[in-house]
């Protein structure tokens, strides 16, 4: 069993992508760093390129062992869903290009893991992230969701290990 594992949680978005790095060592979860990427560019393709560059910089700087990425949820607007899917593809590509395995989680699974219900509000998720990590949640909502994805994944790893499946 590894002495510690570092996970980057990512909440993809075409306007704002939240990310959070959480390390588990001896069963203790620690916030390493977190932030939000607001890609810039003259058009959508340029913004996707900027998202890739900025996220690749984060991955290089923190060298996570694994990535927990929030899956695309059903959007009411088809065009919005397509853009979100493209942003998510960029996120997966940035992780894969740096050898970081990507594990997908539905938003409802992440919420249930942190709050106990898959229909929790972002504020509730952010509050619980702060409680789990022992910090005051002063980050953007997308960043809180990304940290929640990382925590959800670390908890899944621990449960799998305890069940003797890993």
From Swiss-Prot:
Mg(2+) 1 binds at residues 11, 142. Its cofactor is Mg(2+). The active site is at residues 11, 70, 142. Binds 2 Mg(2+) ion per subunit. Gene3D superfamilies: Ribonuclease H-like superfamily/Ribonuclease H (3.30.420.10). GO terms for cellular component: cytoplasm; Holliday junction resolvase complex. Keywords: Cytoplasm, DNA damage, DNA recombination, DNA repair, DNA-binding, Endonuclease, Hydrolase, Magnesium, Metal-binding, Nuclease. InterPro entries: RNaseH-like_sf, RNaseH_sf, X-over_junc_endoDNase_RuvC. It is found in: Cytoplasm. Its EC number is 3.1.21.10. GO terms for molecular function: crossover junction DNA endonuclease activity; DNA binding; magnesium ion binding. Mg(2+) 2 binds at residue 70. One of its GO terms (biological process) is DNA repair. It comes from the Bacteria. It catalyses: Endonucleolytic cleavage at a junction such as a reciprocal single-stranded crossover between two homologous DNA duplexes (Holliday junction). Its main location: cytoplasm. Pfam families: RuvC (PF02075). Homodimer which binds Holliday junction (HJ) DNA. The HJ becomes 2-fold symmetrical on binding to RuvC with unstacked arms; it has a different conformation from HJ DNA in complex with RuvA. In the full resolvosome a probable DNA-RuvA(4)-RuvB(12)-RuvC(2) complex forms which resolves the HJ. The RuvA-RuvB-RuvC complex processes Holliday junction (HJ) DNA during genetic recombination and DNA repair. Endonuclease that resolves HJ intermediates. Cleaves cruciform DNA by making single-stranded nicks across the HJ at symmetrical positions within the homologous arms, yielding a 5'-phosphate and a 3'-hydroxyl group; requires a central core of homology in the junction. The consensus cleavage sequence is 5'-(A/T)TT(C/G)-3'. Cleavage occurs on the 3'-side of the TT dinucleotide at the point of strand exchange. PANTHER family: CROSSOVER JUNCTION ENDODEOXYRIBONUCLEASE RUVC. Belongs to the RuvC family. This is Crossover junction endodeoxyribonuclease RuvC. It comes from Nitratidesulfovibrio vulgaris (strain DP4) (Desulfovibrio vulgaris). The gene is ruvC.
């Amino acid at each position: 069993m590894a002495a510690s594992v570092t996970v980057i949680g990512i909440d993809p978005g075409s306007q704002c992508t939240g990310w959070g790095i959480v390390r588990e060592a001896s069963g203790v979860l620690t916030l390493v760093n977190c932030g939000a990427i607001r890609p810039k560019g003259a058009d959508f393709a340029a913004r996707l390129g900027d998202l890739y560059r900025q996220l690749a910089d984060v991955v290089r700087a923190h060298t996570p062992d694994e990535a927990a990425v929030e899956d695309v949820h059903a959007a009411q607007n088809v065009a919005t869903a397509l853009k979100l899917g493209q942003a998510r593809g960029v996120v997966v590509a940035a992780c894969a290009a740096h050898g970081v395995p990507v594990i997908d989680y539905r938003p409802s699974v992440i919420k249930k893991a942190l709050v106990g219900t898959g229909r929790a509000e972002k504020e509730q998720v952010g509050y619980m992230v702060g409680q789990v990590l022992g910090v005051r949640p002063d980050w953007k909502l997308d960043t809180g969701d990304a940290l929640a994805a990382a925590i959800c994944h670390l908890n899944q790893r621990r449960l799998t290990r305890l069940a003797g499946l890993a």
